[in-house]
């Protein structure tokens, strides 16, 4: 089994990458689901503030790699040649996946601040921030988890400042090439 991970700042296109992969039949393990489930169990609404606080709590109580460790079994349960992990936020998580999955490769999605802000304002998800200040705050929080270090560890970089069609073509080509690998 080949395992790849996707990393990027908020609204860079990680979720879109995952949708494209799923459309190609690639199983996706979403790290954020661990956090969303913990927020739900706590009886809280899935706002950006609650999700961020829960992620901070899990990392404070169990270590910066806690969420990755909770996802390892879900990845191992997949019966596919290629599996995607969505939502990597730090270098500690990258280390966990490289330890458990030889040949693990990390894909960084790179997108300008302006494009990311525009996307956040358009998609209106419950955990989205709708202002430049809110996005800067979210970026700072995630960079504090080691996201900048994780981005530096990327094996592959994909720019996502263009159209959805351009990004879809790049992701599709990349996934098809990875599916052909032993």
Curated annotation (Swiss-Prot):
Name of the protein: UPF0200 protein Mboo_1593
Database matches in Gene3D superfamilies: P-loop containing nucleotide triphosphate hydrolases (3.40.50.300)
Coiled-coil regions listed: none
Organism, scientific name: Methanoregula boonei (strain DSM 21154 / JCM 14090 / 6A8)
Binding residues annotated for ATP, in chain numbering: 8-15
Keyword Nucleotide-binding: yes
Pfam families linked to this entry: AAA_17
Protein family according to the UniProt entry: Belongs to the UPF0200 family.
Gene Ontology terms for molecular function: ATP binding
Entry keyword set: ATP-binding, Nucleotide-binding
Highest rank taxon of the organism: Archaea
UniProt cross-references to HAMAP family, sorted A to Z: UPF0200
